[in-house]
């Protein structure tokens, strides 16, 4: 089910590393897979790629962000059983809990897809005194730039989804 090794991805390109993390099946104790452990140089490369992508992402239309998130929903749904099995192996979760976490992943991306086209500003009434008659304030929500996340290990799909999906939705 799992590949022998997994790279890390930077700017949509697979990256290998000199150091790998062994991942053991929590039930059998056997080696399940190995994943690349990025070094400081790879982290700097990822940060540079994120900074470079900031403007194009800011200009990415809400409907396009929605389409990306909906594509994720579709792909996660197709691979639901595979994702649940990987959670069982990697995190030691019972299959029922793992399946529930995959469902939550899908729901989080679905909700983010729905909200991607609803992230708007506000019109504020500033007519708080006679001298302010006809005054209004306007807000507009705009992406600020790259974000970084640190998530705990106990819900690896769910807790990452709660950071990544809204970030994509917001641009």
Residue ranges and their predicted role:
Residues 26, 38, 150-152:
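Generic beta-structure capping elements
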Residues 126-170:
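Conserved small-residue-rich beta-alpha loop and adjacent elements
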């Amino acid at each position: 089910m799992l590949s022998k090794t997994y790279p890390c991805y930077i700017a949509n390109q697979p990256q290998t590393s000199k150091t790998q993390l062994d991942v053991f099946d929590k039930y059998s104790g056997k080696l399940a897979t190995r994943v690349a452990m990025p070094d400081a140089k790879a982290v700097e490369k990822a940060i540079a790629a994120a900074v470079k992508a900031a403007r194009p992402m800011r200009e990415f239309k809400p409907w396009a962000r929605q389409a990306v998130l909906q594509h994720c929903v579709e792909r996660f749904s197709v691979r639901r059983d595979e994702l649940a099995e990987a959670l069982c192996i990697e995190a030691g979760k019972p299959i029922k809990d793992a399946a529930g976490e995959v469902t939550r992943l899908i729901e989080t991306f679905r909700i983010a897809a729905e909200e991607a086209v609803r992230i708007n500003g506000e019109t504020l009434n500033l007519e708080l005194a006679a001298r302010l008659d006809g005054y209004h304030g306007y807000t507009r929500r705009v992406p600020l730039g790259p974000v970084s996340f640190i998530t705990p290990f106990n819900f690896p799909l769910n807790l990452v989804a709660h950071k990544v999906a809204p970030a994509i939705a917001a641009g």
